[in-house]
Amino acid sequence: MYHLLIIITTLSFSSINITFAVDEAFPSIPTTFSVATKQHYDVKPIHHEVYDGERKIYDISHQYTPELPVWESSEGLGNFLRLAVSMKNGSDANISKMELSVHSGTHVDAPGHFHDHYYESGFDTDSLDLQILNGPALLVDVPRDKNISAEVMKSLHIPRGIRRVLFKTLNTDRRLMFKKEFDSSFVGFMVDGAKWLVENTDIKLVGLDYLSFAAYDEAPATHRFILERRDIIPVEALKLDDVEVGMYTLHCLPLRLVGAEGAPTRCILIK
């Protein structure tokens, strides 16, 4: 009788379905499943690039992986992330640690990146203006056969009043951010293109689709020119392959790294 009772109880328990509260942060997880299978639940998260609901949201930040390219390296980001505390080793929780340059992946530059007096004065990523980093933005398609010179800037016909512009270039077509080897032939701003931008537009945020908004051969000079002004924010290594030309709402939120001249940044576009 005792054994029979155990069998009946087990069978009854396994047939019970329990409904849990819906967690919209994890839409891939169903809300009803068997208690008996709960411990062996084999759910897989969904990694979105585009969220298509009431509003279309584009994630224009790159994933941080060991293959992510880094400046002047053929090895990529490497093993930047490790599980320092592990439940498998008896701990109560999993805790990861990471080590990487603040200019890795999608990131912003602060004035102290190329100006030591600004670095010493505290012009860090925590001092960047969120009003500039968030708001209406124009995505433009750059001619594919050249860097962004004054001539190219003039040809784009960016109207006055536009404060945030994302430049989609040959870098996106070549998928350079998906290749771990650094490629110095990437498209970027020339010094004269940066000067034309300052003198003829109202742009305060410049977004580009590789590790530097400035072309490789003129990177120091172009960075110095733009960052010296302290009123233009470069956003680098944007992921623009899923996005069409046009107007969007941009949200860029850098980590608040006090004292740092750059910071990893989560950027999204909303249509």
Swiss-Prot record:
This protein's record includes keyword Protein biosynthesis: no
The UniProt keyword set, sorted, is:
Extracellular matrix, Secreted, Signal
GO cellular component terms given for this protein? extracellular region; nucleus
Can you tell which superkingdom this protein's organism belongs to?
A: Eukaryota
Any one biological process term the GO annotation gives: L-tryptophan catabolic process to kynurenine
Q: Which GO terms describe its molecular function?
A: arylformamidase activity
Protein family according to the UniProt entry: Belongs to the Cyclase 1 superfamily.
Protein known as: Cyclase-like protein 3
Organism of this sequence: Arabidopsis thaliana
